[in-house]
Amino acid sequence: MGRVTERRKVIRIRDGAVSTRPDTLVAEEPLEIRLNGKPLAITMRTPGDDFALAAGFLVSEGVLAEQRDLQNIVYCAGATVDGSNTYNVVDVKTAPGVRIPDITLERNVYTTSSCGLCGKASLDAVRTTARWPIADTPPVRVTPELLADLPDRLRASQRVFDRTGGLHAAALFTEDGELVDVREDVGRHNAVDKLVGRALQNADLPLSRSVLLVSGRASFELAQKAVMAGIPVLAAVSAPSSLAVDLAAETGLTLVGFLRGSSMNVYAGADRVALRAAVGQG
């Protein structure tokens, strides 16, 4: 628990000079997520906020949607031969009456730090019905100026990145640009799960007046996680994938990419971005 960084000795070469020095690395360890005692998924993550990560993952799977859906989450002892607790296995127990989607029951997958969708049988299988449809969320409007300010604020909040240079991050902002929460992880999808899981634990779902900002690209999976949490605006500092754009268009999600300086691309849901000039075709 809390094993966020590790120190390792490295050989540094700079301007032809060679030296040996310690370096701080981001920790990466497997986390097995069990659902009601049954193995469900393994993800490579940065230790910390494991319960929130597991809860957020299950929100994106359509298992959890409200705080009352969750009974408890515990670390599992006995995961090793000597029976010790490695803090790398968690068991999520749902509240009585919570229906587990068939797709979740059929899954037993390995997800990497960058792709949580590895192991999905098909694209159609992950188009789960959201409990909080984006189209039903209250009207949210953000300005390009507000969006342009968010990446620098996210970067300023990345404390572990400052020590390692090796972490992704995700942040929740209000529609007025107030920073609500920031999570870091070796995987973008884990960082988002930690945000969403914490919101579920605090009974803050749906996040219907929120803007989600992610470092790096916006994949289909990240768009799905935003939709399942009821987040109306997803912004990324890099490019979205074609499937992310398709999902955003289908669900009404506002998707912004290449958010750098005062420049950005709006790929879907432009009605939530307060544009002052008419959009031309070029």
Swiss-Prot record:
Source species: Streptomyces coelicolor (strain ATCC BAA-471 / A3(2) / M145)
Family: Belongs to the FdhD family.
Protein name: Sulfur carrier protein FdhD
InterPro entries in UniProt: Cytidine_deaminase-like (IPR016193), FdhD (IPR003786)
GO-annotated molecular function: sulfur carrier activity; sulfurtransferase activity
The entry's keywords: Cytoplasm, Molybdenum cofactor biosynthesis
Reported function: Required for formate dehydrogenase (FDH) activity. Acts as a sulfur carrier protein that transfers sulfur from IscS to the molybdenum cofactor prior to its insertion into FDH.
Family matches, as NCBIfam families: fdhD_narQ, PRK00724.1-2
Primary location recorded for the protein, binned into one broad class: cytoplasm
UniProt-annotated location(s): Cytoplasm
CC annotations in GO: cytoplasm
Active site: 115 (cysteine persulfide intermediate)
GO BP field: Mo-molybdopterin cofactor biosynthetic process
Superkingdom of the source species: Bacteria
